[in-house]
C-alpha cells in the first residue's frame, strides 16, 4: 500500500479506525439514521444496487408543482375513449342503468388498482421495468410487457391524432368540405359523385377524401400521402412535447389537459340550445334496468374502467415516480378517477345533445322524402286520397302528421305496403343507431356540425380538442416507454426519445396505407386488451400475494403518514384479483366465440360490410398478443433457472451522505481496511436500533424471524414492522 495513502496515515495515527459495518453504523449521525437506507441483497430477494439507486433518486427530475402532476395524470387517463367509447357503451348497455355497474367496478377495481400503481411508482421511483424488478425479480418481465403494449398503442393512437390534424386544417373554409357531395363534370353534364350519393357527404369525405380506403385489409393500395404528412406532423408534435421529459411535457399539460374541458363546456352550452338536444339526452339516460342483469354489460363496463384509467401501460407508474415520497397518492387516485368519470359523463351529455339535434334533422329529412313518395303515389292513383287525414298539410308536414298518415296507409294497404317502400321515420330509430369510435368523431359529429351556425369555428374547436386529448394520452404512453428504458439502461434521454419517435413514424406507415384503417381496428381491438389484463392481474398478484398486502399497507403508512382504509386490503388481496381473472377469462372466451373481424368499406356498394380477418392477419394478431405477453414467462424462466442475474448475488451497504458502498462479497478475508469513516469516536451516536443493524452472511434479522420473511420490497429493504394487530 502506498505510504502516503489515507489508510497508512491513519494506521500510524491515534485516530479511531472502523473495523466493521457495526462500527460504521455506530458512527452515523442521528440525522443520517432517518435518511439512511440499509440494503442487504441476499439470496432470497436481491435488488438493484442501492448506491446507484440513491444517486438516481436524488438526481431524478420532479414535477414543478402538484397541479402539473395532476394535470399529467388527467391528460393521460382522459383520452379519446372518453369521447367516443363511453357514450356508445352507455347507449348500448342500458343508458342510465349502465352507470351503476360502471361505478361499482370503478370502486372495486379501478380506484384500488390505480392507487396501487401510483403507490409503487412513488415509493420505488422507477419506471415499470425497475418497479416490478424491484418488487419481484422473477416477475420483472411485467415492465417489459408494459413497454411493448405502450409501443403498440402509440403506433396506432398517433395515427388518430394525424386524422384529427387533417380535419383540423380542412376546417378553415366555408362551407366545410364535407357538407356537400362533390359534383363530377363531364363537358356540359354534371352529376353527383355516385359513391357519395349512395351514402352521405360526411361518410364519403371520411372514407374517400381522407382515408381513400381500399375494399379490404388484403388490398394495400399504397401509401396515402395526405395521411403520411399528417402522421409526420403528429409525431413531430409528440416528439417536441416529450423530448425533455417532464420538463417539457409538464408545461404542455397545462394546455392539453385543460383545453378539452373548455371545448366540452362550450359544446354543451351550444348543444343544449339546439332543437332536439333534450330528446337525445333523455334517450341517453333513460335507464333500461333489465340490462343490469346481462353479464356482457358488466364485462364491457369492467373493460372500460380498466382502459379509462390507463392501468398496466406504465404511464401511471412513470408519472408518479417523479413525485416526492410523502405525496398523498391516495388522494390523487380518488381525484383522478372521479375526474375521469365526470369527463365521461360530460362527454356523453355533449355527444347525445348533438346527436339528438342530428337525429331530429335526419328525421325531418326522412319525413320530407317519404311525403314526396306519397304525393307521387297519390298523383298516379296508386293510393287513394281518402287515406290521407283531412288535417294533413303536405306543405307544412310535421313528424306527428306523417306518423299518423303512415299508420293509416300501413293498415289499409297491408298486403301491398312493403312494395311502397315507405319508412316509419321514427326519432327513436335515429337515436338507436349506435355509433362509436371514428364513426362518431369523423362522420356523425362532423355531419351535425355542418348544421351549426358558424360551423367552421365549431369544427376547428372540436378537432383541436381531439388533438389535445390524444396528445395528453400520447405523452403518458411515451413515458411508459421512455422512463423505464432510460432508468434501466441509462441511455441518453433526448437521443432515445427522438429515436423512438422516428422509429414509430416509419413503423406507423403501416397505418397510413389505403388499408391502414383496418390495421388501426386490429391493433385497437386486439393488440392491447388481453395483454393489459394479464399485466394488471400479475401486478396485483406481485404486490398482494408475493410481496404481501400487510407489508405493502405498512409501507404506505410510512410513506403517506396515515394508514389507508382496510377496504384496500381486501380489494387488493381478494376482490380485484378475482375480478381481473374473470375479465381475462371472459376476454379469451370472447375471442374464441366471436371470430375477429372488421368493418370494410365497399366502394361499389357505398356501404360497410363486416369481414373476417384473413389467415395472415389472424397470424399477425396472434403474434401481437404473444409478443406483448412473452417477456413475462421468459424473464420468469431465466431467473428461476439462474440464467439471468437478478442482482441477488451481492451484499451491499449504501449511505446517502457518505455515498459509500462496497461489495462485501468481493472483500478479501483479512482485509482490515475495508470500511473507514473519517469521524472521531466522540462523535458517534448510540448504537442503531435492531431493525437497522447490519446483517452478516447467514445471520437472521428480527424482521425475518417474524411474520415478514422477506422484508419490505424483498429482503433488501428492511424497516421497522407495524404490529399486525393494527391492521
UniProtKB/Swiss-Prot annotation:
The modification Phosphoserine is found at residues 13, 20, 665, 701. The keyword Membrane applies. Residues 680-727 are annotated as: Disordered. GO terms for cellular component: cell projection; GABA-ergic synapse; glutamatergic synapse; membrane; plasma membrane; postsynapse; synapse; synaptic vesicle. The keyword Ion transport applies. The lineage of its organism: Eukaryota, Metazoa, Chordata, Craniata, Vertebrata. One of its GO terms (biological process) is glycine transport. Coiled coil: none annotated. The modification Phosphotyrosine is found at residue 377. Synaptic vesicle transporter with apparent selectivity for neutral amino acids. The transport is sodium-coupled but chloride-independent, likely driven by the proton electrochemical gradient generated by vacuolar H(+)-ATPase in an overall electrogenic mechanism. May contribute to the synaptic uptake of neurotransmitter precursors in a process coupled in part to vesicle exocytosis. It is found in: Cytoplasmic vesicle, Secretory vesicle, Synaptic vesicle membrane; Postsynapse; Presynapse. This is Sodium-dependent neutral amino acid transporter SLC6A17. It comes from Rattus norvegicus. Glycans are attached at residues 186, 393. Residues 698-709 have a biased composition (Polar residues). Residues 1-68, 117-140, 244-251, 323-333, 472-494, 550-569, 642-727 are cytoplasmic.
